[in-house]
UniProtKB/Swiss-Prot annotation:
Keywords: cGMP biosynthesis, Disulfide bond, Glycoprotein, GTP-binding, Lyase, Membrane, Nucleotide-binding, Receptor, Signal, Transmembrane, Transmembrane helix. Residues 29-469 are extracellular. It comes from Drosophila melanogaster (Fruit fly). GO terms for molecular function: ATP binding; GTP binding; guanylate cyclase activity; peptide receptor activity; signaling receptor activity. PANTHER family: GUANYLATE CYCLASE 32E, GUANYLYL CYCLASE. The keyword ATP-binding does not apply. Residues 873-1003 form the Guanylate cyclase domain. The chain crosses the membrane at residues 470-490. This is Guanylate cyclase 32E. The gene is Gyc32E. It catalyses: GTP = 3',5'-cyclic GMP + diphosphate. GO terms for cellular component: plasma membrane.
Amino acid sequence: MPGPCASAAAFSCILVLLLLGCQRSNPLAAGATVSSMRRLTDTINIGFLAEYSQMRVTLGGLPLAIEDVNKNPNLLPGKKLAFKPVDIGHKMSAYRVKPLRAMTQMREAGVTAFIGPDESCTTEALLASAWNTPMLSFKCSDPIVSNKSTFHTFARTLAPASKVSKSVISLLNAFHWNKFSIVVSSKPIWGSDVARAIQELAEARNFTISHFKYISDYIPTTKTLSQIDKIIEETYATTRIYVFIGEHIAMVDFVRGLQNRRLLESGDYIVVSVDDEIYDSNRRVNIMERNYLDPYIRKEKSKSLDKISFRSVIKISMTYPQNPHIRVPIYGLHLYDSVMIYVRAITEVLRLGGDIYDGNLVMSHIFNRSYHSIQGFDVYIDSNGDAEGNYTVITLQNDVGSGASIGSLAKMSMQPVGFFAYDKNSVIPEFRYIKNDRPIQWLNGRPPLAEPLCGFHGELCPRKKLDWRYLVSGPLCALVVVVAIALLIKHYRYEQTLAGLLWKVDMKDVTVINLGEYNNPTNKNIFQICRQSILVVGEPNKRSFTNIALFRGNIVAMKKIHKKSVDITRSIRKELKLMREVRHENIINFIGASTDHGSVIIFTTYCARGSLEDVLANEDLHLDHMFISSLVSDILKGMIYLHDSEIISHGNLRSSNCLIDSRWVCQISDFGLHELKAGQEEPNKSELELKRALCMAPELLRDAYRPGRGSQKGDVYSFGILLYEMIGRKGPWGDTAYSKEEIIQFVKCPEMLQHGVFRPALTHTHLDIPDYIRKCLCQCWDEDPEVRPDIRLVRMHLKELQAGLKPNIFDNMLSIMEKYAYNLEGLVQERTNLLYEEKKKTDMLLYQMLPRPVAELLKRGDPVEAECFDCVTILFSDIVGFTELCTTSTPFEVVEMLNDWYTCCDSIISNYDVYKVETIGDAYMVVSGLPLQNGSRHAGEIASLALHLLETVGNLKIRHKPTETVQLRIGVHSGPCAAGVVGQKMPRYCLFGDTVNTASRMESTGDSMRIHISEATYQLLQVIGSYVCIERGLTSIKGKGDMRTYWLTKRQQPELTPDLISTVDTLDTYCSGPRESMEVSVHQYCSPASNNYRLGSCNCDTKCLYSRRSDDNVTNSHGTSEFPKVSEPAQVNCNQLCVCRLNSSQMFNNRGPRSAPSITFRL
C-alpha cells in the first residue's frame, strides 16, 4: 500500500494535469493570454505566495527588494518591477487547492515568476514546472523539490538541513578524522536527514562510521540521561570522534556524560556538534551552561559543567548575517535574496535578447552560480537549485582583549574560528581558519587522533615483555591511596557537618507568644515591641502574618510545615545547611527548624511591620516615591543574591513573601527547602494555589511537573507582577472584571484570546507610570522566557527609579522613618476628627430616644433611679375608626399613614416643652413637667399642643384615601406620677401611676376631634388663663366612678396680631430696638409652688429671629444695648428687625430635651 507521501504526490500530479487539461481545452484563450503577457514591456509582475498570519515580520523583505530593484539603474533598465501578493492561508492538509487557484489567476494576469510559497511547496513547484515558469522559495524545506528532472524551474535561497553534511565531512577531512561515530537525537525533525546525508558522503569518501546511535524523543529526564550513559558505555572504547546531531540541550547532557566518565580531560576525545542554531557574534552567551538554556530544569552548581570539558567541543552552526545595518528575521533576508537573484537572472536574459517567460532559460542563469547575499557573504546555488548555506566553526576561545593567556579558563567563551569556502569543481567545501593566528585551542596542544597509534585495543603495537610503567605503578598506587584518604577525610567532615544538626531548634528553648494575652507580664514587653506593626497594618487578627515566639531572648517567626510525617533525608539536611549559610540584608535569616513530635516548624527572624501585601492593602499608609523606590531596590538586591547563590531561584515571589522589618527594610522569604515542603497539606490550599498562580510565569503554569524552585526567568516575570502591584496598590492584576480562575486560564492559554497574550493593563488610563517602567514591565512579562531580561538587567532598567535615593543607607532609613512619623500624625488627627463626628451623631440619636439627663447618666454608667413628680400633665391621642380603617387598607398603607401622622406630630411637639413617651399602634402619649420640672406650665404646654394637633389634623389627608382625613380623639389629665428607665437592653423611659390610667380614660371617653380634659387640668388652666373650656358634666370613668370633665375648645390671645404668636417663658426678656417705640404687656401669675413667671407678647411689624446664647445682650443693626427687666404690662412694637434671646441662667436649664423654643414665630 503506498504511503501518505506517495498519495500526496499522486494527488498533486492529478491537480496539475487537470489544470493543464483545462488550459489545453481552450488553446485560443491560452494563446491570447500568453500573447498579452509577452506584450507587457513596461512593468514586469511577479507573484508572491505566503501565509500572512505566520510571516508578518518576514513579508517586509519583499517590498524592500522591489524598491531597491527599481532604484538600481543596472537592473531591468527601462522597466519596472511589481508584485502581486496572495495570502494562501494556513496549511491544513497536503492537498491545498487555494495556492494552485491563485497561481492560475496570477499567470493569467501576466506574472513572469512566483516567489514562495513558505513551508510546503511540492505541489506549487510541480505546477510551475509544468508551466515552465520560474519559482523561487525562501522558506520551503521539502527535500523532493531538489529533483530537477521533475522540478526544473524551482530554486530556493534557504539551504536544506542536509547541506550541513558537506561542512561536517570537510571538517573531518581537514583533521584526518576518518573514523567517527554518529549520535542522533530524534527530537529535531531534520536530524535524521542530516545523519543520512553525512553517512552517504562518508561512505563515498571511504570514511568509517564506527557506531550509529539514536536518542529517541529527548527530554531531560533521568530515563533519557541513562540512555545517553548507555550509548557512551557502548561506544567510548572504539571511537574518539563523536558527531552529535541534535538540540543544544541534548548535546550538553551528552558532554556531561563524557565528563562523568572522565573522558574529556586528556583531550583524546572530541565532539562535533551540529544543530540549527544561528550563531550571533555580538552575543557573548556562555552556551556551555546548561542552566542558561534549560530554564525549567535546574542543576546544583556542584553538578554544572566545567569549562575544560567544552574545550573538547567543536560546534558547526549557521553563519549569522554579517550586514550590521540589517536586523530582521532570517527568512526576511532569504526573501530579499530570492527577488534579487531572479531580477539579476532576467536582466541577463533581456541583455542577451532572450525570453523572460522561458523558465528553463531564466533558471540556467541561477543554477551553479554564486550571489552576494544581503546577509553579508556569498551564497552558492548548486545544480539542484539549492543554496549551499554558510556555516561557521565555533570553539571555546579566550575573549578578545581579556588579557588572559592562551589556555586560561578565566575568560573564555565560544568564539568562531573557521568557515567553509565552496568551489563549483569540488563536492565538499574547504575548511579555512578565519584568522591564521587564531587557531583552535586544543586541550593537549594538538588535534586528537581518530584512532590511537596502537589501535583501540593495542593491536597495532607489539607488546614488550618489560614495561617501564610497571616500575612506577607502586608509587602511583600509593599516591592514589593518599589522595583517596584525603578525599575521604574531607567527605567525612562534610558528613559530620550534615549530621551535626546545627540547624535544629529544641522546642524547650521556644516560648510561643500570644499577643492577645496582654495582661500576661511575660508578653507585655513583647507587645510593646510588636505594636508598631499593628499601627501599620491594623489589628493583629486581621493580618496575614505568622505566629511569633521567643527563642534565646530574640523574637522569631514560626511557620509550620503541614505534613503528617517527615523523614529528614540527606538531601533535606543539605537544604537546611544551605539555608543557614544564606546571609544577606534583604534575605530573611533562617534560624533553624524543629522536628519534634513528628511535625516541622521553621524559625526565621521576625519582621515587625508584616508583609508587603499588608502594607500595600493599608490605604491609610501613604507610600510616596521614596518608599516605593527603597522597597523595589531591596527586592532587586535580594533576588540578585538568590540568583547568584546555590539557591538559584525563588519560585514563589509575591508580595506576601516580602517582609518589612522595623527599619522599613524589605526582606525576601519563603524560598528554598523545596524537598522538605513537597507534599504538605496546607490549609486553604486551593486559595493559596490561586494566589501563587496569579504571579507565576505562563511557561510554569503550563508545566504539569514544574519544579518547586521555579526558574530565574519565572522570577523575573513574578517581579514584574510585584512591581505592578506596588505601583498600582490594587492587587497583582489591578482593577479587572475577571476572576482569579479566568486570569490564570487566559495567561496559561493565550490562544483563548483574540489579541494574544493576557497581561495586566498598562494603559495611561489604568496606570500613570513613566515610560521606562512600562517598558520594563513589558519585557518582564514577555511570553518567551528567553527574551526576558535577567534580574541584573532589570535593575539597570529601573536605575532611574532609584534616582532619589541617597547613597547612605542610614540617611534613607531616617528619611523613611521621618515621613512615616508625619503620615502617622496626620492619620491620628484624621481618626480623631472622625471619632468626634461619630460621637456627635451617636449622642444626637441617643437624645432622640431618651431624655437628655437620663441619657447622660447612662453614658456615664450611673444608675438611673426612679423619680416621683408632684404634678405633671399627660396627653393621650387616638385615631378614630383606626380598626375599621385597617380592615380596608393593606399593611403597607397603614404603616405609611401612621408614619405621616407621627412625623407630623413629632414636628409639632418640638415647639413645646413636652416629652414624647411612646406610641402604641395609633395611640400617641406625650407628657409635660418631667423629667425636668417646669412649675405649673405643663398644663398650658399640653393644652397648647392639643389645640395645635387638632388644628393640624384637619388638613392631614390619608394618602391612599385622599377624600378622607384623620379624625383625632385627645384626652388630658394632670396629677402626680413616677418615671424611670426600665430594662438594660433597649432601655425605655416609662411613666407609672394612676395619672397615666386616668389620662388614658380621658381619651377613650372623649369624642372625635375634641379635647377631653379632667377637672385637675381645668383648674391649672384657669390659673394660667386664656384657655376656653366648656363643662361636660359628670362622666363615668372606668375604675374612678363619676368625674367632672371639660372640653378644651380654644385659647384666647387678646391684643395679639395674627402675624405673630410668642410665648415668653423666662423672667428676663429683651427686645432690641428704640426704647420709645416699645410697649410691653406682661401678665403676672403665681404657680402653686409660689414661683413667679411672666408671660409677655411681642408684636413686631417686622420679622423676628430667635437665638439662644449664654449672655443677656441683644444685638441689632444699630449696635449693642441692654434693657432692664420687664416689670410692667406693656405692648412691645418692634419697627426694626429684632433678635430675642433667652437668659440661660433662668428657666432654660429646666427644659426637657424636646422642649419648644421659648419664642415661636409664625411668619
